[in-house]
Amino acid sequence: MSKSNQKIASIEQLSNNEGIISALAFDQRGALKRMMAKHQTEEPTVAQIEQLKVLVAEELTQYASSILLDPEYGLPASDARNKDCGLLLAYEKTGYDVNAKGRLPDCLVQWSAKRLKEQGANAVKFLLYYDVDDAEEINIQKKAYIERIGSECVAEDIPFFLEVLTYDDNIPDNGSVEFAKVKPRKVNEAMKLFSEPRFNVDVLKVEVPVNMKYVEGFAEGEVVYTKEEAAQHFKNQDAATHLPYIYLSAGVSAELFQETLKFAHEAGAKFNGVLCGRATWSGAVQVYIEQGEDAAREWLRTTGFKNIDDLNKVLKDTATSWKQRK
C-alpha cells in the first residue's frame, strides 16, 4: 500500500490489534436533532446534543477501536473518549441543500484538514452524496472537490476516509424497490471511481451494495435479489477497490446489520470493519430525553454495550485486516 508511514500509523490508531476498524459513528447532527425532536416539543439545545455525545463516548468507546465525531457538537465527547480509542473528525456540513439539484458537497467553513489534525484527529472523514448517473456538470464538481480534500490530507499527512452515499434524483425513496434495483451498480461504480489514485482516499466508508430488506431469505415482502445475486453484488463490490473499505450501518437495526456482515463475509467480501452509528446507540436518544442522563447511561451500559459487544464478536468472525489490501 503506497501510504506514508505516518498515515499507516494513524490508521493503526483507528483499528484494533487484528487490523480491523471497529469504529463508533456519532457525527450525526441534523439526523440526531430530528431524532431528539420526536421526543420533545422544544428545539434540542447545543448543551443537550453535546452531553448525549459525551455520554456515548464515556460509556462505549472502551469497546470501540475509534470514534467518529463532528467538530460542531462532538469536541467535548472527543475529550471524554477512552485513551486507547482513536478519533476521526467529520469535515462536511451536515445534510445538503434540498432546493438545489445535485447534492453538492460543502466543508465546514471554520475547519481545514490542518485544524482537524490539530484538534487531535487521527483521520479526516468526508461525506459525499454521489450518483454515477448524474449529469457530468454535477459530477465533475464533486470529483474536483474530493481531489482538493485528498490533496489537503496528503499535505497534512493525515488519512482521508471518504464516505459515499448513493442516490438517484429520479427515485425519491432510496428504501424503495426501484432504488434497490439500481443500488448495486451505483454503490460499486462510485467505489471504483474514488479508488483512483488522483483522489488520495485512504479508506472508503460505504453502503452495502444491496438493500437487505429485498434479499431472498431476508425479505418480508417483494424480493429484488436472490441470495446468489446479492452475494455476487458483494463480490463485485470487493473487486471494485484495492483500498481498505468499511461498512456504514445506514440506520438499520443492530440485528440486521450483524446479519448483513455475516452475509457479506459468506459472499466473499473482504471488508475491513465498520463505522456503526445508530444501530448501536439510537435507543439511548428517547431514554435520554424522557428519563434523563442516568437512565441513558444505564441504557448504554446494558443495551448499548450488548449492541457493540455483539457487533465486535461478528466482526471478529467476518472482517479482515486492512493491511491485507494492496
UniProtKB/Swiss-Prot annotation:
Keyword tags: Lactose metabolism, Lyase
GO process terms (BP): 6-sulfoquinovose(1-) catabolic process; D-tagatose 6-phosphate catabolic process; lactose catabolic process via tagatose-6-phosphate
Record flagged with keyword Lyase: yes
Family statement: Belongs to the aldolase LacD family.
Protein name: Tagatose 1,6-diphosphate aldolase
Bridged cysteine pairs (disulfide): none
Broadest EC class assigned to this enzyme: lyase
Species per Swiss-Prot/TrEMBL record: Staphylococcus aureus (strain MW2)
InterPro entries: Aldolase_TIM, DeoC/FbaB/LacD_aldolase, LacD_aldolase, Tag_1.6-dipho_adolase
A GO MF term: 6-deoxy-6-sulfofructose-1-phosphate aldolase activity
Catalytic reaction equation(s): D-tagatofuranose 1,6-bisphosphate = D-glyceraldehyde 3-phosphate + dihydroxyacetone phosphate
EC number(s) on file: 4.1.2.40
Gene3D superfamilies, per the entry: Aldolase class I
Functional pathway: Carbohydrate metabolism; D-tagatose 6-phosphate degradation; D-glyceraldehyde 3-phosphate and glycerone phosphate from D-tagatose 6-phosphate: step 2/2
Domain of life: Bacteria
Listed SMART domains: DeoC
